């Protein structure tokens, strides 16, 4: 990689760090190519990305971003996972690390908040933004449905009483 390519890569990685909701840094020593490809595909399917970058270039790319505090984590063979949704990257990385003990989570960042490995694992246990939205919609819809049932029930009862009264008058 020559200097121009490095500059271009750093600019691209800087943009990725600025746009991401969360960043996870992990050691990947000992992962096979197949395992790394599996991690990349799982992250891509979830809406994130995985990148192996030279530590020096990653530290330069972090400058000027909210995630600048995680620069110390870039030692050894590191991989960076990031996604726009703050929960996606930690969730996929932690699930993959459970199945593959060669992936060791070092820490990460969510916005300006620097996270250690336990913080990333805690973040991974939270529901995703889409799941939270679905729960919120469910909470809003349930009372509205109950209200509709309650308001329509008296009208139905009145109609039955009037119908019974009309049948009684016809019979008499």
From Swiss-Prot:
Stored SUPFAM superfamilies: Ribosomal protein L10-like (SSF160369)
Annotated Gene3D superfamilies: 3.30.70.1730, 6.10.250.290
One of the protein's GO biological processes: translation
PROSITE patterns: RIBOSOMAL_L10
Keywords linked to the UniProt accession: Ribonucleoprotein, Ribosomal protein, RNA-binding, rRNA-binding
Quaternary structure note: Part of the ribosomal stalk of the 50S ribosomal subunit. The N-terminus interacts with L11 and the large rRNA to form the base of the stalk. The C-terminus forms an elongated spine to which L12 dimers bind in a sequential fashion forming a multimeric L10(L12)X complex.
PANTHER family: 39S RIBOSOMAL PROTEIN L10, MITOCHONDRIAL (PTHR11560)
Protein name stated in the entry: Large ribosomal subunit protein uL10
Organism: Brucella suis (strain ATCC 23445 / NCTC 10510)
């Amino acid at each position: 990689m020559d200097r121009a390519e490095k500059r271009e890569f750093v600019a691209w990685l800087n943009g990725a760090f600025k746009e991401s909701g969360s960043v996870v840094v992990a050691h990947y020593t000992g992962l096979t190519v197949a395992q790394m490809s599996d991690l990349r595909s799982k992250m891509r399917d979830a809406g994130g990305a995985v990148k192996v970058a030279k530590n020096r270039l990653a530290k330069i790319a972090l400058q000027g971003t909210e995630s600048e505090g995680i620069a110390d984590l870039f030692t050894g063979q590191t991989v960076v996972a990031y996604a726009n949704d703050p929960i996606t990257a930690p969730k996929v990385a932690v699930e993959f690390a459970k199945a593959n003990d060669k992936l060791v989570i070092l820490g990460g960042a969510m916005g300006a908040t620097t996270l250690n490995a336990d913080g990333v694992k805690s973040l991974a246990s939270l529901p995703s933004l889409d799941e939270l939205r679905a729960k919120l919609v469910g909470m809003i819809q349930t009372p509205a449905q109950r209200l509709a049932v309650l308001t329509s029930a008296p009208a139905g009862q009145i109609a039955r009483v009037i119908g019974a009264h009309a049948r009684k008058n016809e019979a008499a």
